Amino acid sequence: MAITKEDVLEYISNLSVLELSELVKEFEEKFGVSAAPVMVAGGAGAGAAAAAEEKTEFDLVLTDTGAEKIKVIKAVRAITGLGLKEAKDAVEKTPSVLKEGMNKEDAEKAKADLEAAGAKVELK
């Protein structure tokens, strides 16, 4: 019996977030592609305006916990003020937005603190 697209979709829909993330990484490595969204080129005026305007607000996104999960949870609690359960949930469900609308200085400091704890972080 051949595997159908529906079988594949059913299997994927039953994966956990972590398993799905690992699957995407394996696809990226095997096929040499990126899961990043495709950027559509804007007009010349829009590109020049975007380059002149520096971003002032950042979202802190935890992309990977790393090996030191407990240290990362402690860092998340210190940065966000979340309780232990909420911080643990945020760390286990990567990628997750930890804090939105941060200024550049605070965002860079938070990123450095999380990276020191062993996490991988992006500022968006």
UniProtKB/Swiss-Prot annotation:
InterPro entries: Ribosomal_bL12 (IPR000206), Ribosomal_bL12_C (IPR013823), Ribosomal_bL12_C/ClpS-like (IPR014719), Ribosomal_bL12_oligo (IPR008932), Ribosomal_bL12_oligo_N_sf (IPR036235)
Cross-referenced Gene3D superfamilies: 3.30.1390.10, Single helix bin
Keyword Ribosomal protein applies: yes
Pfam families with a match to the protein in the record: Ribosomal_L12, Ribosomal_L12_N
Compositional bias per record (Low complexity), positions renumbered to this chain: 115-124
Keywords: Ribonucleoprotein, Ribosomal protein
Region (Disordered): 99-124
One of the GO biological process terms: translation
Signal peptide segment: none
Residues spanning the membrane: none
Cellular component GO terms, alphabetical: cytosolic large ribosomal subunit
Biased composition (Basic and acidic residues): 101-114
Keyword Ribosomal protein: yes
Molecular function GO labels: mRNA binding; structural constituent of ribosome
Subunit text: Homodimer. Part of the ribosomal stalk of the 50S ribosomal subunit. Forms a multimeric L10(L12)X complex, where L10 forms an elongated spine to which 2 to 4 L12 dimers bind in a sequential fashion. Binds GTP-bound translation factors.
Similarity section: Belongs to the bacterial ribosomal protein bL12 family.
Function noted in UniProt: Forms part of the ribosomal stalk which helps the ribosome interact with GTP-bound translation factors. Is thus essential for accurate translation.
Name of this chain's protein: Large ribosomal subunit protein bL12
